Amino acid sequence: MINKDYKKLYLVTDYRIPFNELLEKTKEALIGGVSIVQYRAKNKKTKEMCKEAKELKKLCDEFGALFLVNDRIDVALAVKANGVHIGQDDMEVFIAREIMPKDAVIGVTVHNKEEALKAIKEGADNLGVGALFSTNSKDDATLMTLETLREIKSVSNIPLYGIGGITPYNLNKDILENLDGVAVISALLNSDNIREKSKEFLNILSK
């Protein structure tokens, strides 16, 4: 059985980084303490995605980290990923739950209390909540207010991961007390020292 207990630091990959470089960066993040990796690859061919996902899954296995695939359930199944992460425009959660193995982890991006309740009811294991800050990784991201974050926290019985423009320096007490962890792209992958940046995040998240 896969351990679905939440982990605090969650890396989402950046498809704009050449894959060999991304693999090295991901390894550094795992050494630093990242415990979930989500493979996100927009506009890539399925064959290429399967190849890359397989390599990342192998790397995650070496570190005992969970490996999830964004959106593409077919790719997740092909490489025996630990689960998937789906957005509001992707497959319905209950359908994903029917297709994926019984112990698969299913994460869902939500933007308000109603979406959170629906995802939980349909079988989500964790929620990505945001965007908490402006981000270059998603052009159409709408910022979430602290009030909305608190509303989601009040109805959720599963882990919440903050997403969107998160750095070690903008995670204040009000935000942290409503999250179980954070999902990060740029703040880790664009860092000069990914390993140390991961540890910096974990230090803040552990307070």
Curated annotation (Swiss-Prot):
Binds 1 Mg(2+) ion per subunit. 4-amino-2-methyl-5-(diphosphooxymethyl)pyrimidine binds at residues 38-42, 70, 109, 138. It comes from Clostridium perfringens (strain ATCC 13124 / DSM 756 / JCM 1290 / NCIMB 6125 / NCTC 8237 / Type A). Its cofactor is Mg(2+). Pathway: Cofactor biosynthesis; thiamine diphosphate biosynthesis; thiamine phosphate from 4-amino-2-methyl-5-diphosphomethylpyrimidine and 4-methyl-5-(2-phosphoethyl)-thiazole: step 1/1. Mg(2+) binds at residues 71, 90. It is an enzyme of class 2 (transferase). The lineage of its organism: Bacteria, Bacillati, Bacillota, Clostridia, Eubacteriales. Keywords: Magnesium, Metal-binding, Thiamine biosynthesis, Transferase. Its EC number is 2.5.1.3. 2-[(2R,5Z)-2-carboxy-4-methylthiazol-5(2H)-ylidene]ethyl phosphate binds at residues 135-137, 165, 185-186. GO terms for cellular component: cytoplasm. Condenses 4-methyl-5-(beta-hydroxyethyl)thiazole monophosphate (THZ-P) and 2-methyl-4-amino-5-hydroxymethyl pyrimidine pyrophosphate (HMP-PP) to form thiamine monophosphate (TMP). This is Thiamine-phosphate synthase. It holds the Pfam family TMP-TENI. InterPro entries: Aldolase_TIM, ThiamineP_synth_sf, ThiamineP_synth_TenI, TMP_synthase. Belongs to the thiamine-phosphate synthase family.
